[in-house]
Amino acid sequence: MGERRSFDWSGLRSGGAASGAPEAAPGAADPAPVPPVEPNDRPPAPPIPLRVNDLKQYAYCPRIVFYQYAMPVQRKATFKMEHGKAVEEKLEQLERRRKLREYGLAEGTRRFQVWLTSERLALSGRLDLLISTARGGFPVDFKDTREPVWHNHHVQLCAYALLVEDSLGQPVSTGFIYRVPRDDVVVVDITPELRLETLSMLQAMRAMIQAERMPGPTPVRARCTDCEYRNYCGDVF
């Protein structure tokens, strides 16, 4: 057998190297300090939550959205607002009498007053009617008007389509606008171009609100007559 060596116990002192982490080598550099977080390094702020109806208002007159978000003011109730509330209470009863074939659909399930929200889009809204089929969803927006369907209505309907896809997982290729006084249906194709325009408008609205810069008024002065914010547009009246 070889020579038996005795173990050196002298290094096991309280606080010595054997009792914890090894001692740093002579001349070793200290760990680099963690740099402070600069303002530009912080994660971006979440997008401003908006409502679908804001898109229609922004296309109608961008100042409406500005007054609601960047400079909240007390608005005056107009005849259009009060009349619109009364009509909404009757629409569901009228719609239940309609047949799905009037939308060009053979089958489907109808849901009224569907609340939709998307955290990814930072968007929410209440859809008047959603028709769900095996092919996907068909959003329906009710309008109490005999006038033509304007482009801002297309944008609003497209926003509902984006919400149906994002929150319910139902693909949408077509939506409908039901004009109650005329009892007719306007078909709106949810095209890639309309989708891009809708998303771009949401981005422009948020930039306006963050900048707190009042936009110009609508060039169509007839729209100002029944506006609930007309008293605040000193450069128009």
Question: What do the PLM-derived regions correspond to, one by one?
Answer:
Residues 31-38, 192-221:
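Short, charged low-complexity linear segments at domain edges
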Residues 57-60, 68-69, 89, 196, ...:
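Charged/polar, solvent-exposed surface patches and flexible loops
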Residues 68-77, 166-171, 235-237:
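Short helix-capping/linker segments at secondary-structure and domain boundaries
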Residues 85-89, 94-100, 118, 187-195, ...:
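Short, charged low-complexity intrinsically disordered segments located at boundaries
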Residues 86, 112-117, 143-145, 206-222:
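Hydrophobic transmembrane alpha-helix bundles
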Residues 118-209, 231:
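Nucleic-acid nuclease catalytic cores
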